[in-house]
Amino acid sequence: MAQLYFYYSAMNAGKTTALLQSSYNYQERGMRTVLYTADMNSRDNRYKQIKSRIGLYASARVFNIKTNFFDQVVTIHQKDIIHCVLVDECHFLNRNQVIDLSKIVDVLNIPVLCYGLRTDFRADLFSGSLWLLAWADKLIELKTICYCGRKANRVLRIDDQGLIIRDGNQILVGGNNRYVSVCRKHFVEQLESPLSLTKRVYKNR
């Protein structure tokens, strides 16, 4: 039986690499996959390249807040059988889209693998993550580490000087270099510290 999977982590845990590897595993066995990634400023049915930090890449359909995953996958599936749907940056999904993905699993019997962040720089859940935590059949945490060596499960947003940013929009387009993954302990300490992240890391060594 197909299932809906949610692979979540802090930043730089290899989510995109894991997605591309999973897609490759299907394709290596002659099975067809459909990949999606977020682009909130594009129209449906356009394509975008998914690229991992280690250089792996693949073409993917883009989704925005208007994308109907179920209708799209039904149309594609009728022309050529789909064996797996994989969604990158799934934290940008909304409630209806998560339900769409569950229908792909339950009605079409196609597994859906979603990869994304669980929480933002304030440790608040993203919309997509909230609904996937409620609707997914399987929850899998992908692990990365804090500068102290503990498991990182939070992200901090920083400015050019390494100072912690505590307020602002939840989504910062193209701002991956503005985030640092840390453990819960150092997430709280950083929010309470006047030091820049760089000075704080040096002090803790």
Curated annotation (Swiss-Prot):
Enzyme class: transferase
MF annotations from Gene Ontology: ATP binding; thymidine kinase activity; zinc ion binding
Ubl conjugation listed as a keyword: no
Gene3D superfamilies per the UniProt record, alphabetical: 3.30.60.20, P-loop containing nucleotide triphosphate hydrolases
GO BP term, example: thymidine metabolic process
Record SUPFAM superfamilies: Glucocorticoid receptor-like (DNA-binding domain), P-loop containing nucleoside triphosphate hydrolases
Residues that, per the record, bind Zn(2+): 146, 148, 183, 186
Active site residues according to the UniProt entry: 89
GO cellular component, one term: cytosol
Entry annotated with the keyword Zinc: yes
Residues annotated as binding ATP: 9-16, 88-91
Family according to the record: Belongs to the thymidine kinase family.
Assembly notes: Homotetramer.
Descriptive protein name: Thymidine kinase
Organism: Blochmanniella pennsylvanica (strain BPEN)
